[in-house]
Amino acid sequence: MRMRPSPRKAVFVLIDGARADVLRELVDRGDLPNLARWVLEPGGGLRIGTTVFPSTTGVAYIPFLFGRFPGNVGIPGIRWLDRAEAAGGWRAQWRAMRSYCGVQAGWINRDIAPGPSLFDLVPESIAICTPITRGLRPGAHRIPLQRAFFGAAAHYFGSYGALDRAVAQAWVATAAESWRLLFVVFPGVDGVTHLRDPKHPAVVARYRAVDDALGAFIARVRQHGELPAFFVAADHGATTMREHRDVAVELEALGVRTARHPMHVWRRGARVAAMVSGNASVQLYFEPRSGRTTPRTESEIPAAFLEPLLDYSALRLAAYRADQANESGQPEVIVRTQQGRARLSESPGLIRYEPLDGDPLGLGGYLELEDRELLLRSRDTDVPDAPRQLLQLFATPRAGDVVLAAVPGADFRGPWEIPEHKAGHGSLIREHMEVPIAASVPLPNDPIRTVDVMPAMLEYLGVPLPACDLDGMPFSKLVSRSTVPGAPCRSTNPRARWISARCRTPASQWIAGAASSRSSCPPSICQPVRVTMARNRPRASASFP
């Protein structure tokens, strides 16, 4: 009798806050031998993808677990305002000032719009250390108490090693169990980055801890059968913060009463509510106690508030809804900087970028392109995928009236925060939006979004994609344009993430972005070159030049 083959298995490892350049550096130095051997080599190397805006923990998990952009499922940030409840009594006001950073953290599971999660689609799933648990079977959410206890202690005392060790032990313990999908989150890189900087030796130690855990899991799981497929990614990047420009505090100094977390949730007579995400982005809601439930559009936004914000040295851009919507009723978006103003809109199959004054997104002028083409074009700017991300954010009426994104090195929350965030994320800038994506299965050469990982895992597992629309695409449908006759060769474009046998862009430039010009070599040779990773190099010093 012929035996049926065992169903495929997959493991997703989320290294919260991992920067692609740091990961690349550590791989090149031989500091992550297990990742190199078991993931990067069989999958063809590391890709750099783009995450979502706001680029912050929890919100940026949604693409991996739902295949959707956060705005399309009603989650505009890690903090946001429920306009309807904000005009109620003190209990309603507390509920309205939504924050997934404290006791309301679990509410994200009910706030996400109805739709199947990865755990619904793959019932034989186990998750470790994730705040989003919707769809998990009873008992499939591991170490919830340890996550709560060690997570709180780590936030105030920096003891992320204990939390990562708990994750590693729980992960290794699953090797002998029956499952089809493991979803494993390591919070340490992000947590220590906030306390130090993205390249601090203590942060590097957290990357190594993840690699050690991967090696321990592989050693254990090989005793029980074949290896699963591995998918590894981060949810956002990070930058060191040199300037804290606390919008809420500055508005208060101007006499504008501002509701904000954590101590001014019930601010009496509040004219503005400031809801920070990742610290490098903030959403402003005007007249939060008015009872108005609909967002404001351009003509309704007080210029007396907006214009001074545009002069902030910390501001990369501001965005808000245009007065008009598209034919589907979705809002068009106005993008502002001190020097420029542009309109973003979407029609079936196309996104339109229309500069009205200057070029605030740095795209070179008017564009009307298919979504993935615009993604590719935007990768050469300092705000990759900004058009799509701003449109998806304002797709939910829960988003603020005005959204601000910071420049590198700046955020919108003061040093009073306990502990002070010496590094952070949340903005639309490249350093926050670009993330590493790797897999032990072949990856496409076209630009990848984190929202593509969920359908790719389903495709690998042989699970049908849900009937509802997904914002991501399985890897098999991301056909490289380098194979299309007459397509331009992009082998030395650092955002295209491939290298050519003839053009010979070094891997370090391919990943870190040292090269900047497009090659003129013919498309026929624009094929990916496999990068061989060192397996047994000695560990280098845990410091960066």
Indicate residue ranges for each PLM-predicted region.
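C-terminal substrate/ligand-recognition segments
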Residues: 383, 388-419, 426-466, 475
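Short, solvent-exposed turn/loop segments enriched in Gly/Ser/Thr/Pro and often Arg
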Residues: 45-65, 129-135, 471, 475
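Secreted, luminal/periplasmic, and some membrane-associated catalytic domains
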Residues: 24, 30, 42-59, 78-107, ...
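Active-site-proximal N-terminal segment of extracellular/periplasmic enzymes that hydrolyze or transfer
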Residues: 1-45
